[in-house]
């Protein structure tokens, strides 16, 4: 228990020591007052200084009139220190009071300030006038609990939707045409590609496979007006091929083929060739069809949009090509394929469906002989049917489930929908009745069928005790099943079909739990309500009588708020209490009443206050009022409530969240309310707890049923797929390591050098990878046949170019003048017969000044060589010996001749620079090898 809550202003003053007197002196009624006592004077001074702003030391007088009987019960007068003696009354129709109290000693240390309130505020209820009138109800009637439910016993059969599909055998017939194309190189043969095509066998070949266990090695296809024939191994012969079992089988599929290896022959070198391999495939597999059997699916994943029971005349679903559908009766076929002399069986009705790539065949059977859309789930030997406003509740405590159905029902007999369960349901009901009820009960009507909200089907057979049946017969009441009172009609087939796919037992278990809890709670609440009603009636009578003693307390407890009430005849008048300023409420520490003797001294009288004196103010008022502390923080006006002083005395008064203890009418201490025991007046309601109900985990469908529910079995499909994969003979795989070995070694080496080496290795690796990629590209290009051919052409072209350059260079070396000056040879041949030779014996031929070497353009008027017209190479000059100067002059003449011959291109492009201003070209450098260039200016004498 914690400490008491702190007061608001924390100014609780201790009692004055002068008031702590021995009990003997208190009993005498005398009070010692010695002015010479220093500690008494000091305490009085401190108290006067502290409480002077709040409490006036003037004489106060008060007159209080009782609010109960309308008369005055007491009056007191007294005097005190000087001060205001006038009073300000606060009147009401029954109570009047002024602001004076009997003259007594009042100091600041005699008050407990900063009080708290917990439930009700400090208020005055005796001043209020009643405005509202109430009375207690005394005519309360209590009705007993009635469940209002009709229950019937019976036998219940619960059927679930049969989610296991109809499974049957299907035969498929097809031919696989495999075309392989290849290219033969010198030493290597490349498989360029292949195509695989599946085609359907014609019906006559299907009959041959079913009866004789073989098919043919050719296939004819008509496209437009043309026929295309393919032969196995390109033999161009139509031969029979026997069916043999394939090695790869599964639990639901058996496959028979004619060849196990694919045929292919390579062509000649540098030639393409395409071959054909033909394989007949007969497959015996399983197909599944789910209610309402509108389609079925094979284990390979193939779906047929037709009912397996369609025979061209019944009304079952069929959405395939009717022209490709055939039905044969009394059809003969082998019991198994791939065997020699296998037995033959006769199928009453066989269906064939042709598709472009496959032929399917299956046996047609009667649906009622092989299928049923309902399956028995549970048999409840003892069940209860409870009738409600719009529904029936079928309760099975053994299953801990409640099944809710509508009141509409169907009969088990004369209903074709339930032909598949009628016989078994009747046998089960008869067996349960003989074992459980024979001799005590009798059947109440015929079995009827209900459909639950969870999608289940309930077959209900009502029962009735033989004793009740005999009484009903004596009373003339016709015995009938409870279900016959309701209309029976045929439900919509579409609604029932939708209902059968929504089975869920969670709803049934939840409904059972709700019904169990509802019945228990409703019964308990009904009994509690009845007992509560009786208790309220008794309590009303008791409160009516107690209100005659203290109406305010009774009405405050009833309305749970402060109310001022008083009797007004046979009714009660109500009014609201007046709240005071909560911060100004203070309680006096001394409950003794003092009187003034003849000599003017204050002495304790024979009477003490029965309740502590309270000091307070009204809201929006500065005048201090006095009263006495009542119950629940109520302030009683006046201080006339006294009693004869009794010693020893112990009184505890509750104010807010705390209590004040007074011993011998003096304040002792403050007590926490939690430390005071409470008298418990609460009447406990004893209700039996709800009994434990262990819910059972119900399994509507087993794992096998759930696995078989889907027409597509993933396991079978994957096994079939893997079987096809194992049949692939040629699997090409190529693993290329893009990192060359030397690059990996370089990377390991660089990584050992640290961070710098690793970074450098990354750079070198990138560069090396790029180089390797480029080189690899060239290598792969040249290893390709087209790349090799291109390389050969390039090599031949390079050889031819080198040979031509070699011949040209050789011609230039052998005849440089003819090579570099081809026009000179042409001119020599043209003027060979007309040119004369001038012979110079002793001195060189004279040269004109214009014939000297100049850097400027040549003179267009100059013709011939030296003006004589003699041509070099003539017979005359050949025998003549020339000096060095003559050779020099000849070269100058050749230069001028070359410039003249090249003058024509210069005239075509006038914007180009003249030859004299252009730098020496390759031809000039070749012609002038071994010579030095002469100066542009100078006479012929300077040449020497």
Curated annotation (Swiss-Prot):
Residues 807-944 are intravirion. The record marks 491-492 as: Cleavage. Residues 89-99 have a biased composition (Polar residues). A motif (Internalization motif) lies at residues 931-934. The lineage of its organism: Viruses, Duplodnaviria, Heunggongvirae, Peploviricota, Herviviricetes. Envelope glycoprotein that forms spikes at the surface of virion envelope. Essential for the initial attachment to heparan sulfate moieties of the host cell surface proteoglycans. Involved in fusion of viral and cellular membranes leading to virus entry into the host cell. Following initial binding to its host receptors, membrane fusion is mediated by the fusion machinery composed at least of gB and the heterodimer gH/gL. May be involved in the fusion between the virion envelope and the outer nuclear membrane during virion egress. The keyword Disulfide bond applies. Disulfide bonds join 125-577, 142-533, 215-280, 372-420, 608-645. This is Envelope glycoprotein B. Residues 71-85 have a biased composition (Gly residues). Keywords: Disulfide bond, Glycoprotein, Host cell membrane, Host endosome, Host Golgi apparatus, Host membrane, Host-virus interaction, Membrane, Signal, Transmembrane, Transmembrane helix, Viral attachment to host cell, Viral envelope protein, Virion, Virus entry into host cell. It is found in: Virion membrane; Host cell membrane; Host endosome membrane; Host Golgi apparatus membrane. Residues 1-37, 68-108, 834-878, 902-944 are annotated as: Disordered. Its main location: virion. GO terms for cellular component: host cell endosome membrane; host cell Golgi membrane; host cell plasma membrane; membrane; viral envelope; virion membrane. Homotrimer; disulfide-linked. Binds to heparan sulfate proteoglycans. Interacts with gH/gL heterodimer. Residues 24-37 have a biased composition (Low complexity). The keyword Protein transport does not apply. The gene is gB. Residues 182-188, 267-274 are annotated as: Involved in fusion and/or binding to host membrane. Residues 56-785 are virion surface. A proteolytic cleavage by host furin generates two subunits that remain linked by disulfide bonds. Glycans are attached at residues 114, 238, 369, 409, 414, 426, 481, 485, 620. InterPro entries: Glycoprot_B_PH1 (IPR035377), Glycoprot_B_PH2 (IPR035381), Glycoprot_B_PH2_sf (IPR038631), Glycoprotein_B_ecto_C (IPR055341), Herpes_Glycoprot_B (IPR000234). Belongs to the herpesviridae glycoprotein B family.
